[in-house]
């Protein structure tokens, strides 16, 4: 599962996917929260 946090801080993005860690920002400026 990948949650994007383009319009908000990564800290606000990650809780929607338990077990994620913040990755990015990518070249498109989006911070992704990836579920391992």
Swiss-Prot record:
Its main location: secreted. The keyword Secreted applies. Expressed by the venom gland. The record marks 2, 30 as: Important for the neurotoxic activity. InterPro entries: Toxin_16. It comes from the Eukaryota. This is Lambda-hexatoxin-Hv1a. This excitatory toxin inhibits insect calcium-activated potassium (KCa) channels (Slo-type). Keywords: Calcium-activated potassium channel impairing toxin, Disulfide bond, Ion channel impairing toxin, Knottin, Neurotoxin, Potassium channel impairing toxin, Secreted, Toxin. GO terms for molecular function: potassium channel regulator activity; toxin activity. It is found in: Secreted.
């Amino acid at each position: 599962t990948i949650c994007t946090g383009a319009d908000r801080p990564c800290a606000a993005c990650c809780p929607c996917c338990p077990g994620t860690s913040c990755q990015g920002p990518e070249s498109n400026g989006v911070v992704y929260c990836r579920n391992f």
